[in-house]
UniProtKB/Swiss-Prot annotation:
GO terms for molecular function: 3'-phosphoadenosine 5'-phosphosulfate transmembrane transporter activity; antiporter activity. GO terms for biological process: 5'-adenylyl sulfate transmembrane transport. The chain crosses the membrane at residues 46-66, 79-99, 115-135, 138-158, 168-188, 191-211, 235-255, 266-285, 292-314, 317-337. InterPro entries: SCL35B1-4/HUT1. Glycans are attached at N39, N222. Keywords: Antiport, Glycoprotein, Golgi apparatus, Membrane, Transmembrane, Transmembrane helix, Transport. This is Adenosine 3'-phospho 5'-phosphosulfate transporter 2. Belongs to the nucleotide-sugar transporter family. SLC35B subfamily. It is a multi-pass membrane protein.
């Protein structure tokens, strides 16, 4: 605020900074959406949507392909935690580079909060990567689609929440779809192991918590995405490094990867890079068009990932995968619908019956004439 005094006329001029000027230095504009150095705000809404969708599909499809490709390397399956260690190292470097490109490099979120977020991030990504040593990739993706289940269970038992019929129906559809998909996998998959189901279930529980903690911390302290990535993944890197050192899991993993550096470290670099770029487009999609459209796009991406997994990697197939997957998709739709009932208006059963009766009457009248 600037104060200007004029002795001759004796008045005070007060100028209030604009909203853009009053913002934190690391945010250029309220409306600007910058992804990978490109300001999407200069384009039309349709172009922004197409760019974001293309980014999500391209980077995350490559991400999923590389993740399954790494675990298809003979002998790599026991080293899921080491892959997570390497992934956290790359994410920390990417976050540091992005943070250096901003004007404001101060850490805004307290260290204790980052220690909690890092622990949850380790649980989410480490357990998810390790589960691929026991599960088919499509089964893991289907489980990832069902984060609503642990979120609802936590809301009921911890916060005493009550959910509407659409939410309950969504959870039931997801649960039945998961059970059906898992039973199909256990019947035809030669390497099925319940350990993988337990690992991915624990990863889902951590993932259900981490989103709320991250959102609350970033809003409370006005932190940037690059700061969140740098500190949460660098602290998580230390956690995993200590864990692998204490369990003697670091030496064998390093020895194995040194024999095939291109198939391990090379793929891990591309895997981490595409994942880092992919999340940038998802965040841009949420900021411009909202969570409803973002969920729709990411769900389509996951469905495409499952299809490509069956095309590029040889694995047994049964039509139970299709029916159970459709149940999960129905659950996702019901979950999105329950949160956006004012935007999505479905016709009631009464209106549908009335419309059908009117059409029948019109056909009868036409036949009579």
């Amino acid at each position: 605020m600037d104060l200007k005094f004029n002795n001759s006329r004796k008045y005070v001029s007060i100028s209030v900074p604009s909203k853009t000027q009053a913002m934190s230095p690391h945010i250029k504009s309220v409306e600007d959406v910058v992804v990978l150095g490109v300001n999407l705000s200069k384009f039309s809404k349709l172009t922004q949507f197409l760019i974001c969708v293309a980014g999500v599909f391209v980077f995350y499809l490559i991400y999923g392909y590389l993740q399954e490709l790494i675990f298809s390397v003979e002998g790599f399956k026991p080293y899921g935690w080491y892959l997570t260690l390497v992934q956290f190292a790359f994410y920390s470097v990417f976050g540091l580079i992005e943070l250096q490109l901003t004007q404001d490099r101060r850490r805004r979120i307290p260290g204790k909060t980052y220690m909690l977020i890092a622990f949850l991030t380790v649980g989410t990504m480490g357990l998810s990567n390790t589960s691929l040593g026991y599960l088919n990739y499509p089964t893991q993706v289907i489980f990832k689609c069902c984060k609503l289940i642990p979120v609802m269970l936590g809301g009921v038992f911890i916060q005493g929440k009550r959910y509407n019929l659409a939410d309950v129906s969504a959870a039931v559809c997801m649960s039945l779809g998961l059970i059906w998909f898992t039973l199909a996998d256990s019947t035809i998959a030669p390497n099925f192991n319940l350990t993988g189901v337990m690992l991915i279930s624990l990863a889902l529980c951590a993932d259900a918590v981490i989103g709320n903690v991250q959102e609350k911390a970033m809003k409370l302290h006005n932190a940037s995405n690059s700061e969140m990535v740098l500190y949460s993944y660098s602290i998580g890197f230390v956690y995993i490094l200590l864990g692998l050192s204490c369990t003697s899991g670091l030496g064998p993993a390093v020895a194995f990867c040194s024999k095939n550096p291109v198939g391990t470290y090379g793929y891990a670099f591309l895997f981490s890079l595409t994942g880092y770029f992919g999340i940038s487009f998802v965040l841009a999609l949420i900021k411009i068009f909202g969570a409803l459209l973002a969920v729709t796009v990411t769900t389509g991406r996951k469905a495409m990932t499952v299809v490509l997994s069956f095309l590029f990697f040889a694995k047994p197939f049964t039509f139970q995968y299709i029916w159970s997957g459709l149940l999960v998709v129905l659950g996702i739709f019901l979950n999105v619908y329950s949160k956006n009932m004012d935007k999505i208006r479905l016709p009631s059963v009464y209106n549908m019956i009335k419309k059908a009766m009117d059409m029948k009457k019109s056909r009868t009248l036409a036949q009579t004439v």
